[in-house]
């Protein structure tokens, strides 16, 4: 759709002059360059317009004065056709503007198949970002599993300390993307740099704190987590945790830099950094564990080095965009309040997920070394598979706000877009669920050679598939709730899911259902999230049907 300026002629008449002014004056207007958001970046794309803008004089015009705004060819000028020069009228000021052509590529105007094609193309690079982290853990699991079942079991509680705790700092990622994107929309580069510097400082402070806490209390936390019955796996797990803990500052700073790039609509830079990091981790695991025999310590060193390299590459990518990624700024109390107030609902949501998966590992840990090892393998494959649905949540958060709160608000089109996301999510769930189930069922030797561990893995195949297949659709629904700023509901519903599923997990584990009971509790957790999100979106009071946006307006403004 091409949008161009048209000639506009209007007459200003019968406007009384202000008697307090020393002279009657003409009305001089400033040319207006409309901004139409494209679906990709919600900003005008194309060459920058060069405007010579005159000042807008808020005085009165003389009687029967006609103004013409001419814009036939894209250059606009304002001229005075009739006026009384003897009365001291200000001579017209010519305004020349090179008005750019705005190409509107609106996702909402496409057919449902066209929408799905665009969504798939958009989520490609984003999928890579979500895959690299779980891929590193999966590589560690596969390499360590070939050497020792004891170290494979130790990897379970160790990854809880190293990986799951990282997700509690997801609020840094959300706050960075939101604040950077908002500052860019204002075209204020200094404000963008200030926001990045503040969040880099917060990331550094949190990272150093976690590194110190890991060093001081890592062994105690692992002992309390695994229990007395599994004290034999604590030394190996602690070795892994202490080495990985050295990378805490780099991990959180890297998250801030990655999210800043995403806020600038750049997903390829972070993807390249994480691809290099994954390659370093894979090669390091093979060399240090397989050839040099360092075992779980070698896997930890390979992962730690890869995380530091990834953080440096992401910061370097920011520097190439003209921002200083090595500039840190201490935030004021009001700025801290803004950041944490914005990210609090997401923090609660992520904490609920982390706590439930931590409970899964906790109850599995009490069932013996072989069951811990089997659970570790299945959980790593599950995590690797579920991230394929995360880009659907990101897509909803990118494209839904314009249809829900934008100038061209259109709830029917928003519902059609959600339908496209759910269809893709359901299809992706079946495909990923089938492939993700086939790998541990047909090729368990990739992860372990222990027949007992393999047997325990096969016992949870059915609940594993049921939990995995619904996850992508759940992500698309929750992403829509986040886009609609229905933050209170999503945080409360996730907390409720945690409470009910946690109780079910405890009952099934203590009732003698073993590892299978743990995974059926996960099925209940995932399907409850899907059902509650779907119910809210189909409700007449939900963001897709309610015409009253006053409940969400303040949240959108604050964000």
UniProtKB/Swiss-Prot annotation:
<feature type="transmembrane region" description="Helical">
    <location>
        <begin position="336"/>
        <end position="356"/>
    </location>
</feature>
<feature type="transmembrane region" description="Helical">
    <location>
        <begin position="460"/>
        <end position="480"/>
    </location>
</feature>
<dbReference type="GO" id="GO:0015297">
    <property type="term" value="F:antiporter activity"/>
</dbReference>
<feature type="transit peptide" description="Chloroplast">
    <location>
        <begin position="1"/>
        <end position="60"/>
    </location>
</feature>
<dbReference type="GO" id="GO:0009941">
    <property type="term" value="C:chloroplast envelope"/>
</dbReference>
<keyword id="KW-0150">Chloroplast</keyword>
<feature type="transmembrane region" description="Helical">
    <location>
        <begin position="245"/>
        <end position="265"/>
    </location>
</feature>
<keyword id="KW-0809">Transit peptide</keyword>
<protein>
    <recommendedName>
        <fullName>Protein DETOXIFICATION 46, chloroplastic</fullName>
    </recommendedName>
</protein>
<feature type="transmembrane region" description="Helical">
    <location>
        <begin position="119"/>
        <end position="139"/>
    </location>
</feature>
<dbReference type="Pfam" id="PF01554">
    <property type="entry name" value="MatE"/>
</dbReference>
<dbReference type="GO" id="GO:0042910">
    <property type="term" value="F:xenobiotic transmembrane transporter activity"/>
</dbReference>
<keyword id="KW-0813">Transport</keyword>
<dbReference type="GO" id="GO:0009507">
    <property type="term" value="C:chloroplast"/>
</dbReference>
<feature type="transmembrane region" description="Helical">
    <location>
        <begin position="423"/>
        <end position="443"/>
    </location>
</feature>
<feature type="transmembrane region" description="Helical">
    <location>
        <begin position="359"/>
        <end position="379"/>
    </location>
</feature>
<keyword id="KW-0934">Plastid</keyword>
<feature type="transmembrane region" description="Helical">
    <location>
        <begin position="519"/>
        <end position="539"/>
    </location>
</feature>
<feature type="transmembrane region" description="Helical">
    <location>
        <begin position="295"/>
        <end position="315"/>
    </location>
</feature>
<feature type="transmembrane region" description="Helical">
    <location>
        <begin position="198"/>
        <end position="218"/>
    </location>
</feature>
<feature type="transmembrane region" description="Helical">
    <location>
        <begin position="273"/>
        <end position="293"/>
    </location>
</feature>
<dbReference type="InterPro" id="IPR044644">
    <property type="entry name" value="DinF-like"/>
</dbReference>
<feature type="transmembrane region" description="Helical">
    <location>
        <begin position="152"/>
        <end position="172"/>
    </location>
</feature>
<feature type="transmembrane region" description="Helical">
    <location>
        <begin position="489"/>
        <end position="509"/>
    </location>
</feature>
<comment type="similarity">
    <text>Belongs to the multi antimicrobial extrusion (MATE) (TC 2.A.66.1) family.</text>
</comment>
<keyword id="KW-1133">Transmembrane helix</keyword>
<dbReference type="GO" id="GO:0031969">
    <property type="term" value="C:chloroplast membrane"/>
</dbReference>
<keyword id="KW-0472">Membrane</keyword>
<keyword id="KW-0812">Transmembrane</keyword>
<dbReference type="InterPro" id="IPR002528">
    <property type="entry name" value="MATE_fam"/>
</dbReference>
């Amino acid at each position: 759709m091409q949008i161009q300026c048209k000639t506009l002629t209007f007459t200003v008449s019968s406007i009384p002059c202000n008697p307090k002014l020393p002279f009657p004056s003409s009305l001089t207007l400033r040319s207006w360059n409309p901004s139409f958001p494209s679906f990709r970046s919600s900003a005008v794309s194309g060459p920058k317009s060069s405007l010579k803008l005159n000042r807008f004089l808020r005085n009165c015009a003389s009687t029967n004065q006609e103004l013409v705004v001419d814009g036939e060819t894209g250059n606009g000028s304002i001229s005075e056709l009739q006026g009384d020069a003897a009365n001291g009228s200000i001579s017209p000021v010519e305004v020349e503007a090179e008005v750019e052509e705005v190409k509107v590529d609106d996702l909402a105007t496409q057919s449902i198949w066209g929408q799905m094609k665009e969504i798939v193309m958009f989520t490609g690079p984003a999928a890579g970002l979500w895959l690299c982290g779980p891929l590193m853990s999966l590589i560690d699991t596969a390499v360590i599993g070939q050497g020792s079942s004891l170290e494979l079991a130790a990897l379970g509680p160790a990854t809880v300390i190293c990986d799951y705790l990282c997700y509690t700092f997801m609020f840094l990622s959300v706050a960075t993307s939101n604040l950077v994107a908002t500052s860019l929309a204002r075209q204020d580069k200094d404000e963008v740099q200030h926001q990045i510097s503040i969040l880099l400082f917060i990331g550094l402070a949190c990272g150093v704190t976690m590194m110190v806490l890991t060093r001081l209390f890592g062994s105690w936390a692992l002992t309390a987590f695994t229990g007395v019955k599994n004290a034999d796996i604590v030394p190996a797990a602690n070795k892994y945790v202490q080495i990985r803990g050295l990378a805490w500052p780099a991990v959180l700073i890297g998250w801030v830099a990655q999210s800043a790039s995403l806020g600038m609509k750049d997903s390829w830079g972070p993807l390249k950094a994480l691809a290099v990091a994954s390659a370093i981790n894979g090669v390091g695991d093979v060399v240090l564990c397989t050839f040099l025999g360092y075992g779980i310590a070698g896997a930890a060193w390979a992962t730690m080095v890869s995380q530091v390299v990834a953080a440096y590459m992401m910061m370097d990518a920011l520097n190439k965009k003209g921002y200083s990624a090595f500039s840190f700024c201490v935030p004021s109390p009001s700025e801290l309040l803004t950041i944490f107030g914005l990210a609090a609902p997401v923090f609660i949501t992520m904490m609920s997920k982390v706590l439930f998966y931590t409970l899964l590992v906790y109850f599995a840990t009490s069932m013996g070394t072989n069951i811990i090892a089997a659970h570790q393998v299945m959980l790593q494959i599950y995590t690797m598979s579920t991230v394929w649905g995360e880009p659907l949540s990101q897509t909803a958060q990118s494209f839904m706000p314009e249809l829900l709160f934008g100038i061209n608000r259109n709830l029917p089109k928003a519902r059609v877009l959600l339908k496209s996301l759910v269809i893709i999510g359901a299809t992706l769930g079946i495909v990923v669920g089938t492939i993700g189930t086939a790998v541990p069922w047909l090729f368990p030797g990739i992860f372990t050679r222990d027949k007992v561990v393999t047997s325990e893995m096969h016992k949870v195949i059915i609940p594993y598939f049921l939990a995995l297949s619904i996850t992508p659709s759940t992500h698309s629904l929750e992403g829509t709730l986040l886009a609609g700023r229905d933050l209170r509901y999503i945080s409360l519903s996730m907390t409720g899911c945690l409470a009910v599923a946690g109780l079910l997990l405890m009952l099934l584990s203590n009732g003698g259902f073993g590892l299978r009971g743990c995974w059926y509790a996960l099925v209940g957790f995932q399907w409850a999230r899907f059902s509650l999100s779907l119910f809210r979106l189909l409700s007449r009071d939900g963001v897709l049907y309610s015409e009253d946006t006053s409940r969400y307006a303040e949240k959108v403004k604050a964000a």
